[in-house]
Amino acid sequence: LPLTYALAHGAAQGLDILRATPAQLNGRLEARNLDVSGVSSITYARHADDLLILPDVCIASDGDVRSVLLVSRVPAENIGARRVLLSDKSASSHALLKIILRRAYDAVPQYETRALTPEDPVPEGAAGALFIGDDALELYHHPPEGIYIYDLAREWKQMTGARMVFGIWAAARTFAAAHPAELEM
């Protein structure tokens, strides 16, 4: 990404760069083990009193994103109350999937968060699974036979007419108050 490239090549002088999954970054910022981080939009919403959004930078999609997918053994309209697995690497995508399944497909599945692999995308006993990142891209470009694939950004756009904001950059309000010059970009 242009932002991470810029940070790695000089824009982050004097800063420590941590590479981690979105869920790990969310947890570290919530625990105040990070001062500034990319954070899921749902985590920001849950902790808005403690975090400050950094303007002009986000992870969003105005259509297909290909890296946030529901992979299912059955059409989404047939998921109902069946079991759906959630990637342990995400937070916003969990909330997004739950909203889409409930509102667009009248489904209220049993959810279980766990590690998932594209080699066995929908394990026995599950109707579907939520994938993000490289694993989702692999499944998008090489879909297994007999599997339905739903791009959640496209589903959101069709349902709401709005783009989906998956993540934003945020700073702990205490850090922002103590170091305002360091947040100028």
Regions found by a protein language model. Give the residues of each.
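Hydrophobic/proline-rich hinge and linker segments of small-molecule sensing/allosteric domains
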Residues: 57-76, 158-175
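A generic secondary-structure signal marking the coil-to-beta-strand transition
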Residues: 33-35, 50, 66, 128, ...
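Short, well-ordered helical secondary-structure segments
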Residues: 41, 57, 84, 88, ...
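Pocket-lining segment of extracytoplasmic ligand-binding domains
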Residues: 114-185
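Bilobed "Venus flytrap"/periplasmic-binding protein-like clamshell domains
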Residues: 1-9, 19-20, 66-126, 134
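Acidic-enriched, low-complexity/disordered segments with a strong bias for Aspartate over Glutamate
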Residues: 16, 35, 49-50, 56, ...
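N-terminal hydrophobic or amphipathic helices and topogenic motifs
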Residues: 1-60, 80, 141-145, 155, ...
